[in-house]
Amino acid sequence: MDVVVAREATTQAQDKGADSSLRPGGVLRQMLLSDNAPDGLSFKFFRSRYQPGEKAFTSPRHHHAFQQLRWTESGQINYGPGQYISAREMAYFPRAAYYGPQVKDTGVGLLLQLGFHGEHQYGGVWAGVRDEAIKRLKETGTFADGVYADTDPDTGERRERDSGQALYEEQYAALTGKRFVVPHEGYDAPILLHPQAFEYYQAAPGLEIKNLGCFFDHPGPNADIRLSVVRLSPGAAYHFGLDRAQIAWTTDAGLRIEDRTYPELTYLYSPRGEKAEISAGSTAEVFVVEFPRLD
């Protein structure tokens, strides 16, 4: 199990023009957890503090081949015109669902991105082709305000794409020789969840669970992403199973893992195939995400 505490994680400023000019903004970001697993799962999980004015993070209306989950720690975070995720609420962004344009200029939140077999491209082999892919794109077009503009080789006409999407297409072609395609959306739009409106049920003495939702973006009996909240009383334990990779986080102090008691804002990753257990020295509420399985 990997465990990260917010106050111990490095903060990096993504100043305007950074990230190879793909996204404007001045986000203060902490990379918390990530993996490229043997079963094809790729994810990254990070904490961001958004800033006002010229340092606001902006992006055009767009979509992705990967799935996302966003949770707001404090304030409220925008994801489209008139659309906000308030504190301690979350939104699930299904694969291929359009959202935005967004202006993130306030709030602190968590963002999880995940996909399989090139849907999500982070670290590993993708890191090795990123710089060259951006160089090629800049030779044939321009990045500005989160948009990549170039000339369509088939029609000869000017075209505009989300800058992140353009990079994914270029990287995927470089590694596989194939065209990167975002599938048709199965869900029409992001799904805003209000966890406080769900009720707990008692799963065991001292262990309560809220099931928030299961969402299928892939075929298969275990291909759903599962969202829940666990509440632990002193002396109770919650077990992460072997069959799925999972991440979890808590804003409460007192979470116990093995012989250590952790402070508030603790995050953990339990890879598929590993057993893990958490308990609490005092009552703790833990948000849990169970990753899909495609086999």
What residues fall within each predicted segment?
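Jelly-roll (double-stranded beta-helix
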Residues: 1-71, 76-295
